[in-house]
Protein backbone atom coordinates (compact mmCIF):
# COMPACT_ATOMS: atom_id res chain seq x y z
CA UNK A 1 0.00 0.00 0.00
CA UNK A 2 1.43 3.37 -1.00
CA UNK A 3 1.68 5.78 1.93
CA UNK A 4 0.85 9.48 1.85
CA UNK A 5 4.25 10.63 3.06
CA UNK A 6 2.64 12.83 5.71
CA UNK A 7 3.99 12.20 9.17
CA UNK A 8 2.76 13.30 12.57
CA UNK A 9 3.90 15.63 13.88
CA UNK A 10 5.31 17.75 11.07
CA UNK A 11 7.42 19.09 9.55
CA UNK A 12 8.89 16.17 7.62
CA UNK A 13 12.63 15.51 7.41
CA UNK A 14 12.31 15.71 3.63
CA UNK A 15 9.74 18.07 2.08
CA UNK A 16 6.58 16.44 0.76
CA UNK A 17 6.09 17.04 -2.95
CA UNK A 18 2.60 17.11 -4.40
CA UNK A 19 2.12 14.83 -7.40
CA UNK A 20 1.10 17.17 -10.27
CA UNK A 21 -1.14 14.41 -11.67
CA UNK A 22 -3.39 14.78 -8.62
CA UNK A 23 -4.58 18.28 -9.60
CA UNK A 24 -4.73 19.40 -5.96
CA UNK A 25 -6.64 22.57 -5.15
CA UNK A 26 -4.95 25.69 -3.77
CA UNK A 27 -6.01 24.96 -0.17
CA UNK A 28 -4.32 21.55 -0.19
CA UNK A 29 -1.20 23.00 -1.82
CA UNK A 30 -1.07 25.76 0.83
CA UNK A 31 -1.42 23.12 3.57
CA UNK A 32 1.49 21.14 2.08
CA UNK A 33 3.60 24.31 1.97
CA UNK A 34 2.97 25.10 5.65
CA UNK A 35 3.46 21.43 6.57
CA UNK A 36 6.85 21.44 4.84
CA UNK A 37 8.07 24.72 6.31
CA UNK A 38 6.56 25.49 9.72
CA UNK A 39 8.19 24.21 12.91
CA UNK A 40 6.30 21.63 14.98
CA UNK A 41 4.87 24.22 17.38
CA UNK A 42 3.11 25.96 14.46
CA UNK A 43 2.71 23.04 12.04
CA UNK A 44 -0.75 22.02 10.75
CA UNK A 45 0.28 18.40 11.37
CA UNK A 46 0.76 18.75 15.11
CA UNK A 47 -1.18 18.69 18.36
CA UNK A 48 -1.65 22.45 18.11
CA UNK A 49 -3.81 21.89 15.03
CA UNK A 50 -6.54 20.49 17.27
CA UNK A 51 -5.69 21.67 20.81
CA UNK A 52 -7.51 25.01 20.54
CA UNK A 53 -10.57 23.34 19.01
CA UNK A 54 -10.73 20.89 21.91
CA UNK A 55 -10.40 23.75 24.41
CA UNK A 56 -13.30 25.49 22.64
CA UNK A 57 -15.41 22.33 22.99
CA UNK A 58 -14.62 22.20 26.72
CA UNK A 59 -15.60 25.86 27.12
CA UNK A 60 -18.82 25.27 25.16
CA UNK A 61 -19.64 22.28 27.35
CA UNK A 62 -19.01 24.27 30.53
CA UNK A 63 -21.03 27.26 29.34
CA UNK A 64 -24.09 25.31 28.17
CA UNK A 65 -23.91 22.53 30.74
CA UNK A 66 -23.93 19.69 28.21
CA UNK A 67 -21.24 17.06 27.80
CA UNK A 68 -19.38 16.81 24.50
CA UNK A 69 -18.60 13.49 22.88
CA UNK A 70 -16.24 13.50 19.91
CA UNK A 71 -18.01 10.94 17.76
CA UNK A 72 -15.29 10.54 15.14
CA UNK A 73 -11.60 11.20 14.83
CA UNK A 74 -8.98 9.31 12.94
CA UNK A 75 -5.98 9.06 10.70
CA UNK A 76 -6.05 7.66 7.18
CA UNK A 77 -4.67 4.14 6.80
CA UNK A 78 -2.11 5.25 4.19
CA UNK A 79 -0.21 7.30 6.77
CA UNK A 80 2.81 5.46 8.13
CA UNK A 81 1.94 3.24 11.14
CA UNK A 82 4.16 5.12 13.61
CA UNK A 83 2.59 8.49 12.70
CA UNK A 84 -0.91 7.00 12.83
CA UNK A 85 -0.37 5.64 16.33
CA UNK A 86 1.28 8.89 17.44
CA UNK A 87 -1.68 10.92 16.07
CA UNK A 88 -4.29 8.73 17.78
CA UNK A 89 -2.41 8.81 21.07
CA UNK A 90 -1.87 12.57 20.97
CA UNK A 91 -5.47 13.35 20.03
CA UNK A 92 -6.86 10.95 22.65
CA UNK A 93 -4.72 12.45 25.40
CA UNK A 94 -5.66 16.01 24.36
CA UNK A 95 -9.39 15.14 24.35
CA UNK A 96 -9.16 13.42 27.73
CA UNK A 97 -7.18 16.35 29.15
CA UNK A 98 -10.21 18.52 28.33
CA UNK A 99 -12.61 15.94 29.82
CA UNK A 100 -14.15 15.10 26.44
CA UNK A 101 -15.44 11.68 25.49
CA UNK A 102 -14.27 10.20 22.21
CA UNK A 103 -14.72 7.43 19.66
CA UNK A 104 -12.50 6.64 16.71
CA UNK A 105 -13.43 6.49 13.05
CA UNK A 106 -13.50 3.58 12.14
CA UNK A 107 -13.27 -0.11 12.97
CA UNK A 108 -12.08 -1.78 9.76
CA UNK A 109 -12.30 0.51 6.71
CA UNK A 110 -9.94 3.33 5.57
CA UNK A 111 -9.19 4.66 9.07
CA UNK A 112 -9.17 1.21 10.60
CA UNK A 113 -8.34 0.13 14.09
CA UNK A 114 -8.80 -3.58 13.38
CA UNK A 115 -6.83 -5.66 10.88
CA UNK A 116 -9.23 -8.30 9.54
CA UNK A 117 -6.37 -10.37 8.11
CA UNK A 118 -4.52 -10.78 11.41
CA UNK A 119 -7.50 -10.59 13.74
CA UNK A 120 -5.67 -7.98 15.81
CA UNK A 121 -5.42 -4.19 16.10
CA UNK A 122 -3.36 -2.40 13.45
CA UNK A 123 0.27 -1.77 14.55
CA UNK A 124 0.47 0.58 17.53
CA UNK A 125 -3.25 1.29 17.67
CA UNK A 126 -4.18 -0.57 20.87
CA UNK A 127 -1.30 1.02 22.76
CA UNK A 128 -2.17 4.47 21.39
CA UNK A 129 -5.78 4.25 22.50
CA UNK A 130 -5.81 1.94 25.51
CA UNK A 131 -2.28 1.29 26.73
CA UNK A 132 -0.10 -1.80 26.50
CA UNK A 133 -1.46 -5.18 25.44
CA UNK A 134 -1.01 -7.91 28.06
What are the residue ranges of the model-derived segments?
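Substrate-binding clefts and catalytic carboxylate motifs of secreted carbohydrate-active enzymes
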Residues: 1-134
